[in-house]
Amino acid sequence: MVRVLPVVVLLLLALPVRADEIAVPAGQGTLANAIAGARPGDVLTLRAGRYEGAIKIDRPLSITGPEGAVIDGMGQGTVVTIDAPDVTLRGLTVTGSGMNSEALDAGVKILKGADRAVVEHNRVIGNLHGVDVHGGRDAQVRSNTIEGTRQVRVNDRGNGIYVWNSPGTLVEGNSVRWGRDGIFSNASRTGIYRDNLFRDLRFAVHYMYTNDSEVSGNVSIGNGLGYAIMFSNNIVVKDNLSLSDISHGVMLNYANNAEVSGNLVRGGAEKCTFIYNAHKNLIWGNRFEGCEIGIHFTAGSERNVLTGNAFIGNRTQVKYVGTRDVEWSFEGRGNYWSDHPGFDLGGDGIADSAFRPNDLMDHILWSQPAAALLTGAPAVQLIRWAQSSFPATLPGGVVDSAPLMTAPQIAVSDRYTALEADAASRRNESEMNDLDVDNLTSH
């Protein structure tokens, strides 16, 4: 019996301790005290009412509550700091962070070592940064409503979701409005950012030095720029919408080996797509519609494949300043051009004549803008007629040897169409007063 008792005690100690569900009343200091007294794995259930921030969660816990449970930082620092693994924050309102940009004040901050955090179904309102994933691995930020601040200068605002050096982050199903960027991902990798809605921001999604990640199924409406992929490699950008964004829909700047597919950009952006010093990218099955420039291709971008895209009703379909021929078809399949008067006698869906979207006068106008005064002159019209009649006189540029006869269709729901119309009606009232996306050193 003496020998058996220690064995029984050891077995009992090895059994998992049952997590408790603890009701936490609203009031000053009640939440901080409840965290201090909780055991790992406990569930703290808040009641409707106001709770004092700033709080630090330093052990694995779940904190849940109704939307009426408000954690308020009262303008001081970060409202909720997660500093332990396996923490869940669900169903709450988080508001009132400080406004210190150097300290990265936020509604919710996930620190290094706080792996597998889950932040879901919360309202994160009126903070400098909404959710700052700052070193924690495999975080999940899902189905939150995040609304930032509206300082006069957009660049003085914080980001809805900031991901820094946090591999494996999943950002899914969030609605982000106001602030600077919807998602700003910096020095990270293997993230998935999908099915989010972004409105009234500088950039919807902004990548810097982020590799091996995915941006898919997102909707950007009325932002300064939709999807900015910068200094990043091996990114998948697919099935996103950019509706009535102001400057660009999709931008690849020093981005390599990306796959850009199934995206729709429409509604009057200056450039549907901007490709700047980006190499070996596959751009296919996209629809670029109703922009000043369909695609601007510059700074020596090489070895890119463009096939199966549609360029529809853009004032200038392609802006490419170069003297070399660049082929924009792949394996006998090119792109659809709304201004190509082609015909298809073979009935295979491929036009029987190649298409060049630009001519010599386009190159002259891009390099010498003052020449625009001469565009109506008979000599200019004669040059354009001669080049259309004798293609061998063209100086080089984009050539599509297998233009498509039909355009890919990408559906937009009634809800997003209504939001697009609202954003278009407010375009002249945009808050993007200090936006200069073409200054590529400023991001």
Labelled PLM ranges:
Residues 2-9:
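Sec-dependent signal peptide recognition
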Residues 14-16:
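N-terminal signal peptide c-region/cleavage motif recognized by signal peptidases
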Residues 21-52:
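Acidic Gly/Asp/Thr-rich repetitive segments characteristic of extracellular carbohydrate-active
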Residues 73-81, 102-111, 126-133, 153-164, ...:
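Extracellular beta-strand/beta-solenoid scaffold signature
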Residues 271-272, 282, 289-443:
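Functionally critical loop-and-helix segments that line ligand-binding/catalytic clefts
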